[in-house]
Amino acid sequence: MRHANKRGAARLAAVQALYQMDVAGSGVFEITAEYEAFRLGKEVDGALYREADAQWFRAILTGVVEDQKTIDPVIRQALTDDWPLSRLDSTLRAILRAGVYELMKREDVPVAVIVSEYVDIAKAFYEEDEPKLVNAVLDRVSRRVRGEGRGKDAS
């Protein structure tokens, strides 16, 4: 599997783990150990998890947890006034938190790659407007934190 595909699998696994932490109230160390031992690259209930870059997975997961107090206000600022962060479901919050973490902390990864990867993850969970929301929020955040966007300004 190509390096980029392993990172994509790590991003998806990180979003799933963040969701699980949010819903079940699990801790980051417990979830990281569970995913690395039983999920990444393994078969679970007949479904095969893609092989993932475990280091990338850990970096996203621990980074989001450590920086959530910084990440959430950035997301709130990028959302429209009628869409508070608390109104978003756990999956969407996990996608946005992971994407914003990478935009803020992983300057070695191009904006277009980050936005595209997380929009694709959103498309795996949603069919309607949520992928567009992920695109718009991450584009706004990228303009704010990196001074560059992916496309038209959705503000």
Swiss-Prot record:
This protein's record includes keyword Protease: no
Source organism superkingdom: Bacteria
Family: Belongs to the NusB family.
Any matching Pfam family: NusB
The UniProt record lists the keyword RNA-binding: yes
InterPro entries for this protein: NusB-like_sf, NusB_fam, NusB_RsmB_TIM44
UniProt feature coiled coil, ranges: none
UniProt GO molecular function: RNA binding
Keywords from the named record: RNA-binding, Transcription, Transcription antitermination, Transcription regulation
Descriptive protein name: Transcription antitermination protein NusB
Function (record text): Involved in transcription antitermination. Required for transcription of ribosomal RNA (rRNA) genes. Binds specifically to the boxA antiterminator sequence of the ribosomal RNA (rrn) operons.
GO biological process, one term: transcription antitermination
GO cellular component assignments: cytosol
